[in-house]
From Swiss-Prot:
It comes from the Bacteria. The gene is ydeQ. It holds the Pfam family Flavodoxin_2. Keywords: Oxidoreductase. Its EC number is 1.6.99.-. One of its GO terms (molecular function) is FMN binding. It comes from Bacillus subtilis (strain 168). This is Uncharacterized NAD(P)H oxidoreductase YdeQ. Belongs to the NAD(P)H dehydrogenase (quinone) family. The keyword Secreted does not apply.
Amino acid sequence: MDHMKTLVLVVHPNIESSRINKKWKEAVLSEPDVTVHDLYEKYRDQPIDVEFEQQQLLAHDRIVFQFPLYWYSSPPLLKQWFDEVFTFGWAHGPGGNKLKGKEWVTAMSIGSPEHSYQAGGYNLFSISELTKPFQASAHLVGMTYLPSFAEYRANTISDQEIAESANRYVKHITNIELNPKVRLQRYLKQLESVDLT
């Protein structure tokens, strides 16, 4: 895959008051081959347009789910979106293979410091453990779950750190080699060109 189209689903119930998610959203708006879709902006007061959402998914290779971590999960609209858009027979079940091979990236802003998300830490579990439902969902619908992007200390992070985070975020979600299979293919091509004689 030399060319990749990315869909960023922004799921923040109050993006204007957000420091991190708002900056991340602004940072990716000007990126080529990236579509930004704010779910609360579109669906705060109206039903989810399932057909539109499914067409958006079909038109992109990588799907980024961007949200603040609330109660060890996503804001409620994302759960509703999954329930309505990942339909039986379309995303999973017999004939439900429309998302097979697409890539899934979870991007989260997290209020507490990273050390609080580990065994023995304040929150007891790592972010990888807490995101198991997303990993399982990606697996069920045939998507490749890629490394997440997380920014900790969302409540105390400085403006400079947020700007740096936005730059790292853009690089992370647009890095085609975030998928280890793509990186492996590049390495194999390089090996083919090496003259071992």
